[in-house]
A protein has these predicted regions:
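N-terminal Lys/Arg-rich, disordered targeting/topogenic segments
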Residues: 1-9
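A structural signal for multi-pass alpha-helical bundles of membrane permease subunits
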Residues: 7, 13-298
Length: 298
């Protein structure tokens, strides 16, 4: 019988000073990771405290403690008692669902088309438009929000719900545009030349050749974009006050909620992050794999 060759890890191949440096870096990243996770764990613990006794318990036991009795009913109360502008918590979840769905669909579609055109086609004014697009992303939102608010009011898009979202998601520029631009720029144009020789059109090149190759990376970016839309409270707060999402609704509730209602509010926060954790948990592995682009075989 052949002996099984013992595999050596990367750590065992390092010198002693390298192992020390590696251990220090690992410890620092571990501390950083714990510092990010701990607030959510603490919030989950406080969400199980009795609403009326939270302040008293914190004064007696300190800020960090585990309740003697766990009140899981706080999560039911989050659905039944919390509301904003006449919309209950379930309604806010539904608003967030279509907010993410519509915003993600229109954003990814138009950004992919715009990025592909700027990456693969040369036309007059291309550099000027590209520069203006980059400049618009540099300008702080506080500097453009006033003009944007007035424009939406003049176009009767203010507080129009899905209509506002469909129109504003068709801009074609943004952080996603820059990433897609790099993806399409790295796909060989030889694919398109082969299609043109066979009589294919520009639409055929994009929808049948380029987009399928970029789709894995686009899907990975869609996850991050979707999470950003789910957590986006500013847009709904400023331009869609009648249709509060989970993010904007919980933000407004936090401004006037009493101390007795804090555990129920924390329960609502925990519920709001569950969809994000589920999606990211299932997609995190494929996100890293799908950020590579295939190439031509020689």
């Amino acid at each position: 019988m052949s002996k099984k060759v013992k595999e050596t890890s990367i750590l065992t191949q390092r010198s002693k000073p390298e192992k020390i440096v590696f251990g220090i870096i690992f410890a620092l990243f571990l501390i950083y990771a714990v510092s990010l996770i701990f607030p959510f764990v603490w919030m989950a613990v406080l969400s199980l405290e009795e609403a009326k006794s939270l302040n008293t318990a914190m004064k007696l036991n300190g800020a960090f403690y585990i309740p003697e009795v766990l009140y899981f009913s706080n999560y039911i109360d989050a659905f039944t008692t919390m509301e904003d502008n006449g919309v209950n918590f379930i309604g806010m979840l539904m608003n967030s669902a279509w907010f993410v769905g519509i915003g993600l669909l229109f954003t990814m579609f138009w950004h992919s088309i715009t990025a592909y055109i700027f990456a693969k086609y040369k036309f007059k004014g291309r550099n000027f438009i590209y520069t203006c697009a980059i400049f618009s992303m540099i300008v702080p939102i506080i500097g453009s929000s006033g003009a944007m608010y007035r424009l939406m009011a003049e176009l009767n898009l203010y507080d129009s719900g899905p209509l506002y979202l469909m129109v504003t998601s068709c801009g074609g520029f943004g952080g996603t545009f820059l990433m897609m631009y790099g993806i399409f720029a790295n796909i060989s144009w030889s694919y398109a030349e082969a299609v043109f020789i066979d009589g294919g059109s520009d639409n055929t090149v994009f929808f049948r050749i380029m987009l399928p190759q970029a789709l894995p990376a686009i899907a990975a970016m869609a996850v991050n974009t979707g999470i950003g839309l789910w957590n986006n409270y500013g847009t709904a707060l400023m331009y869609m006050p009648s249709t509060p999402t989970v993010a904007s609704g919980l933000y407004k509730i936090s401004l006037y909620i009493s101390d007795h209602g804090r555990p129920i509010y924390y329960a609502g926060l925990i519920i709001s992050i569950i969809p994000v954790l589920i999606i990211y948990g299932f997609m995190s592995g494929s996100m890293m794999k799908n950020l590579s682009i295939g190439g031509l075989k020689g």
